């Protein structure tokens, strides 16, 4: 089943439907806290920022809050709706949104920005992580911030003679899912698979469920890597 899921998540259509599950996941964990903290330590107010695969704005909106000019690149309408809802809830109406994919953007569109960032999104592009990162370097941005989970078969990160890797950091974090009832569990996993679950899959899912704080949990952890490059000559 995991192989089927991995193939499907690389499509925009998958994320249109998965947005409700992403929202549920976000509401019950602190996955992005350390990433946001790193950004706050390194980003300055007024920077022009492009967030590739912004999702619900979990990284974009904190930068908007400190006065950055942020464009959220998000091709999924389902995920954009989460972004708009979150921006409205925070009273932020100045974030810019671009509904194109990375591959659809001409190189001249976002030249000479202060920062381009991507969190768990480049491996979902048509090009794959390595080629997508190489393309980002060609935008001539002053800084690049990449967040990616480490998984079997992950591509080696490309190097660029124009950029220096200023820091890289790996850490373990919780990435658990919390559900309100068993029907929600089964709906989620059925959507991920794209078809009815087999009896064996139902048994396997039931075995890993844990009850905690009036929720059903599927506990999980992820190894996350954070990487920050700077252009060798920043004007």
Q: Language-model features: where?
A:
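Conserved class I S-adenosyl-L-methionine
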Residues: 1-44, 46-55
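Conserved Class I S-adenosyl-L-methionine
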Residues: 56, 169-235
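Class I SAM-dependent methyltransferase SAM/SAH-binding core
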Residues: 56-104
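Short conserved loop adjoining the S-adenosyl-L-methionine
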Residues: 104-110
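A short, conserved alpha-helix within the catalytic core of class I
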Residues: 124-135
């Amino acid at each position: 089943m995991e192989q089927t899921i991995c193939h499907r998540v690389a499509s925009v259509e998958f994320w249109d439907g998965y947005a409700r599950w992403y929202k549920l996941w976000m509401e019950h964990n602190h996955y992005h806290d350390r990433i946001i903290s790193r950004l706050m330590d390194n980003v300055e107010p007024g920077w022009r920022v492009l967030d590739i695969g912004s999702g619900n704005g979990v990284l974009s909106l904190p930068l908007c809050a400190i006065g950055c000019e942020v464009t959220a690149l998000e091709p999924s309408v389902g995920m954009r709706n989460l972004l708009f809802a979150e921006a409205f809830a925070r009273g932020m109406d100045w974030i810019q949104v671009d509904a194109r994919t990375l591959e659809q953007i001409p190189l001249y569109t976002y030249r000479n920005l202060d920062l381009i960032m991507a969190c768990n999104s480049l491996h979902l592009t048509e090009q794959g992580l390595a080629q997508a990162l190489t393309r980002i370097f060609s935008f001539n941005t002053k800084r690049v911030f990449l967040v990616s989970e480490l998984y079997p078969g992950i591509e080696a990160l490309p190097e660029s003679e124009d950029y220096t890797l200023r820091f890289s950091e790996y850490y373990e974090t919780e990435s658990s899912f919390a559900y309100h009832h068993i029907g929600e569990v089964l709906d989620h996993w059925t959507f991920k698979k794209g078809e009815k679950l087999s009896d064996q899959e139902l048994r396997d899912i039931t075995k890993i469920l844990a009850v905690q704080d009036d929720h059903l949990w599927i506990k999980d952890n992820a190894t996350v890597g954070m990487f920050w490059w700077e252009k060798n000559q920043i004007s």
